[in-house]
Swiss-Prot record:
Any one GO molecular function term: DNA binding
Coiled coil, from the record: 1-31, 38-59
Residue ranges of the region described as Capsid binding: 122-129
Protein name, UniProt field: Virion-associated protein
Gene Ontology terms: cellular component: host cell plasmodesma; virion component
Keyword Disulfide bond: yes
Gene3D superfamilies reported in the protein's UniProt record: 6.10.250.630
Length: 129
Protein backbone atom coordinates (compact mmCIF):
# COMPACT_ATOMS: atom_id res chain seq x y z
CA UNK A 1 0.00 0.00 0.00
CA UNK A 2 1.14 3.47 -0.73
CA UNK A 3 1.58 5.82 2.16
CA UNK A 4 0.46 9.43 2.19
CA UNK A 5 3.84 10.78 1.09
CA UNK A 6 3.86 8.58 -2.02
CA UNK A 7 0.29 9.53 -2.84
CA UNK A 8 1.08 13.23 -2.37
CA UNK A 9 4.12 12.89 -4.63
CA UNK A 10 2.13 11.16 -7.37
CA UNK A 11 -0.69 13.69 -7.12
CA UNK A 12 1.76 16.59 -7.37
CA UNK A 13 3.35 14.96 -10.44
CA UNK A 14 -0.04 14.56 -12.07
CA UNK A 15 -0.88 18.18 -11.22
CA UNK A 16 2.34 19.43 -12.80
CA UNK A 17 1.68 17.26 -15.88
CA UNK A 18 -1.82 18.69 -16.08
CA UNK A 19 -0.50 22.26 -15.85
CA UNK A 20 2.07 21.59 -18.58
CA UNK A 21 -0.64 20.06 -20.77
CA UNK A 22 -2.79 23.12 -20.13
CA UNK A 23 -0.02 25.39 -21.38
CA UNK A 24 0.50 23.08 -24.38
CA UNK A 25 -3.19 23.28 -25.21
CA UNK A 26 -3.11 27.08 -24.94
CA UNK A 27 -0.11 27.19 -27.29
CA UNK A 28 -1.89 24.90 -29.75
CA UNK A 29 -5.03 27.01 -29.61
CA UNK A 30 -3.01 30.18 -30.21
CA UNK A 31 -1.34 28.51 -33.16
CA UNK A 32 -4.70 27.47 -34.52
CA UNK A 33 -6.09 30.96 -33.95
CA UNK A 34 -3.32 32.47 -36.07
CA UNK A 35 -4.02 30.05 -38.90
CA UNK A 36 -7.14 29.13 -40.75
CA UNK A 37 -8.02 25.83 -39.11
CA UNK A 38 -8.72 22.95 -41.41
CA UNK A 39 -10.23 19.60 -40.65
CA UNK A 40 -6.85 17.88 -40.96
CA UNK A 41 -5.09 20.23 -38.54
CA UNK A 42 -7.86 19.87 -35.97
CA UNK A 43 -7.71 16.09 -36.27
CA UNK A 44 -3.93 16.16 -35.82
CA UNK A 45 -4.22 18.27 -32.68
CA UNK A 46 -6.95 16.04 -31.28
CA UNK A 47 -4.87 12.93 -32.03
CA UNK A 48 -1.87 14.42 -30.24
CA UNK A 49 -3.93 15.24 -27.17
CA UNK A 50 -5.43 11.74 -27.11
CA UNK A 51 -1.99 10.14 -27.52
CA UNK A 52 -0.53 12.25 -24.69
CA UNK A 53 -3.37 11.34 -22.35
CA UNK A 54 -3.15 7.65 -23.28
CA UNK A 55 0.58 7.67 -22.58
CA UNK A 56 0.03 9.26 -19.15
CA UNK A 57 -2.62 6.69 -18.28
CA UNK A 58 -0.50 3.75 -19.46
CA UNK A 59 2.57 4.99 -17.55
CA UNK A 60 0.68 5.23 -14.26
CA UNK A 61 2.10 2.66 -11.77
CA UNK A 62 -1.32 1.91 -10.33
CA UNK A 63 -2.52 0.90 -13.79
CA UNK A 64 0.36 -1.57 -14.08
CA UNK A 65 -0.48 -3.08 -10.70
CA UNK A 66 -4.09 -3.57 -11.74
CA UNK A 67 -3.10 -5.22 -15.02
CA UNK A 68 -0.66 -7.54 -13.22
CA UNK A 69 -3.32 -8.51 -10.68
CA UNK A 70 -5.78 -9.25 -13.47
CA UNK A 71 -3.15 -11.29 -15.31
CA UNK A 72 -2.43 -13.40 -12.22
CA UNK A 73 -6.05 -14.43 -11.76
CA UNK A 74 -6.99 -18.03 -12.45
CA UNK A 75 -8.95 -18.70 -15.61
CA UNK A 76 -11.95 -19.92 -13.64
CA UNK A 77 -13.16 -18.51 -10.40
CA UNK A 78 -13.44 -21.10 -7.67
CA UNK A 79 -16.49 -20.67 -5.53
CA UNK A 80 -16.75 -22.54 -2.28
CA UNK A 81 -20.01 -24.35 -1.88
CA UNK A 82 -21.71 -23.46 1.35
CA UNK A 83 -21.63 -26.22 3.91
CA UNK A 84 -24.89 -27.28 5.43
CA UNK A 85 -27.44 -24.59 5.64
CA UNK A 86 -27.88 -23.97 9.31
CA UNK A 87 -31.22 -23.38 10.80
CA UNK A 88 -32.24 -19.77 11.07
CA UNK A 89 -32.42 -17.95 14.32
CA UNK A 90 -34.48 -19.80 16.83
CA UNK A 91 -36.98 -17.09 17.65
CA UNK A 92 -39.78 -17.75 20.03
CA UNK A 93 -43.31 -17.72 18.74
CA UNK A 94 -45.34 -14.58 19.06
CA UNK A 95 -47.20 -14.63 22.34
CA UNK A 96 -50.36 -12.93 23.48
CA UNK A 97 -51.36 -10.64 25.05
CA UNK A 98 -49.20 -8.13 23.30
CA UNK A 99 -49.32 -5.36 25.84
CA UNK A 100 -49.04 -1.80 24.60
CA UNK A 101 -50.79 -2.24 21.25
CA UNK A 102 -54.31 -2.75 19.96
CA UNK A 103 -57.73 -1.40 20.82
CA UNK A 104 -58.98 -2.34 24.23
CA UNK A 105 -62.59 -2.39 23.05
CA UNK A 106 -61.72 -4.98 20.38
CA UNK A 107 -60.28 -7.23 23.01
CA UNK A 108 -56.93 -7.51 21.27
CA UNK A 109 -55.00 -6.70 24.42
CA UNK A 110 -55.49 -7.32 28.07
CA UNK A 111 -53.64 -4.12 28.90
CA UNK A 112 -56.01 -1.34 29.99
CA UNK A 113 -53.41 1.27 28.97
CA UNK A 114 -53.05 -0.05 25.43
CA UNK A 115 -52.74 2.44 22.58
CA UNK A 116 -55.98 3.09 20.77
CA UNK A 117 -56.79 4.40 17.33
CA UNK A 118 -57.77 7.00 16.58
CA UNK A 119 -55.22 8.35 18.98
CA UNK A 120 -56.70 10.40 21.80
CA UNK A 121 -54.34 13.22 22.70
CA UNK A 122 -53.76 13.79 26.41
CA UNK A 123 -55.07 16.97 27.96
CA UNK A 124 -52.92 19.96 27.06
CA UNK A 125 -51.78 18.57 23.71
CA UNK A 126 -52.74 20.52 20.58
CA UNK A 127 -55.65 19.07 18.63
CA UNK A 128 -54.31 17.72 15.35
CA UNK A 129 -57.56 16.47 13.84
Amino acid sequence: MANLNQIQKEVSEILSDQKSMKSDIKAILELLGSQNPTKESLEAVAAKIVNDLTKLINDCPCNKEILEALGNQPKEQLIEQPKEKGKGLNLGKYTYPNYGVGNEELGSSGNPKALTWPFKAPAGWPNQF
